[in-house]
Amino acid sequence: MTLLLELAHGLPWLYFSLVFLFSLMIGSFLNVVIHRLPIMLEREWQAEYRSYFSSDTPQPEDDERYNLMVPRSCCPRCNHPITALENIPLLSWLWLKGRCRGCQAAISARYPLVELLTALLSVVVAMTLTPGWGTLAALLLTWVLVALTFIDLDKMLLPDQLTLPLLWGGLLFNLLGGYVPLGDAVIGAMAGYLVLWSLYWAFKLLTGKEGMGYGDFKLLAALGAWLGWQALPIVLLLSSLVGAIFGIGLILLRNHHQSKPIPFGPYLAIAGWIALLWGDSITRWYLSTIL
């Protein structure tokens, strides 16, 4: 940690460059998580279903291992295995001009976008916070929020496999003297869950519809565990504001049907990340404005 401090103060350009390059690699791994984790969960649910109804349905043979490490990544169209040279974050996509080397099928621009976004957000964290354990924790939180955002956008799902470790990680970090006292973190986790849970049931009783999912409750609880209960109002306010802006924009662009649900997780993630870095400044500005 002392080396990081010396590097940040003596050679800030090198420090930020290392953060950028390392986070590009993290972004590449996040692409794997975003793509594979929902598939892994679906396979697990299907296996559980078959185990419950084994006497009624035939058991398919599926010996293929599938997790974050295996099988090796390949083109979904021609099964061309992706080599190490073709898997360099950001650069490989540019070098291949966004096409598979085997069949020339287009490779989604989402892959380099996730890598670049992860790297840029990480550099902002490094530039905003003083190098230390708090910065490393903020980077970890940022990376998990990126993965949750894109999974929710794709599948309308916030997996427990990410939200629950994030919640317990926030409590553990604050137990060790992190951002807020442990008591504030515990209250933040409880209040974060209960606030959205209450809104969910109030909305359902009034309209008969579900306004959000339980994953949203757990994500706000996790943010409360990291940032404390004091950050919850600003997180809720910012997430509602960001959600309104994106929702209105999609409707105006006619790129979204009003009956189609919009995931709330990405807006919570964006608001939580903003509150992590600038929550105190926003609160002070707001209070000084109205008082």
Swiss-Prot record:
GO terms for molecular function: aspartic-type endopeptidase activity; metal ion binding; methyltransferase activity. Gene3D superfamilies: 1.20.120.1220. Keywords: Cell inner membrane, Cell membrane, Hydrolase, Membrane, Metal-binding, Methyltransferase, Multifunctional enzyme, Protease, S-adenosyl-L-methionine, Transferase, Transmembrane, Transmembrane helix, Zinc. Zn(2+) binds at residues 75, 78, 100, 103. The chain crosses the membrane at residues 14-34, 107-127, 131-151, 162-182, 186-206, 232-252, 262-282. Zinc is required for the N-terminal methylation of the mature pilin, but not for signal peptide cleavage. It catalyses: Typically cleaves a -Gly-|-Phe- bond to release an N-terminal, basic peptide of 5-8 residues from type IV prepilin, and then N-methylates the new N-terminal amino group, the methyl donor being S-adenosyl-L-methionine. The keyword S-adenosyl-L-methionine applies. Its main location: membrane. One of its GO terms (cellular component) is plasma membrane. It is a multi-pass membrane protein. One of its GO terms (biological process) is methylation. The keyword Transmembrane applies. Its EC number is 3.4.23.43, 2.1.1.-. Plays an essential role in type IV pili and type II pseudopili formation by proteolytically removing the leader sequence from substrate proteins and subsequently monomethylating the alpha-amino group of the newly exposed N-terminal phenylalanine. Belongs to the peptidase A24 family. This is Prepilin leader peptidase/N-methyltransferase.
